[in-house]
């Protein structure tokens, strides 16, 4: 848990030094079950976004280094699972075509107020 807390502190300091386009969010998914017991396991879910893949990859590497530093300070280990890909843009042409065809077939009727 202490490593997870130190990781969170590190991410807060990291946020002060990223571009305004970056978005970094995290939550403690697992952090123990009793207030007076130090858990043997803690888990943090972090989401990093930015304008392009290169920036996200750089921020991800930085966050990993923060996690490794937190683990080093607490004599624990840090493990990483990458659950989502990092895409600049992942277009869905078939869905876009279907949506366009539907909008043409069933035009939206607007009122004067809208």
Regions found by a protein language model. Name each.
Residues 1-114:
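Midchain, well-structured core segments that form catalytic/ion-binding scaffolds
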């Amino acid at each position: 848990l202490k490593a997870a807390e130190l990781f969170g502190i590190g991410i807060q300091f990291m946020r002060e030094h990223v571009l305004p386009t970056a978005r970094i969010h995290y939550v403690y998914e697992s952090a123990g079950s009793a207030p007076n017991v130090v858990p043997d396991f803690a888990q943090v879910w972090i989401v990093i976004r930015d304008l392009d893949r290169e920036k996200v990859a750089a921020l991800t590497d930085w966050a990993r280094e923060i996690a490794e530093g937190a683990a080093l300070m607490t004599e624990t280990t840090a493990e990483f699972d990458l659950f989502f890909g990092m895409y600049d843009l992942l277009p869905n042409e078939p869905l876009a075509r279907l949506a366009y065809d539907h909008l043409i077939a069933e035009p939206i009727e607007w009122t004067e107020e809208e």
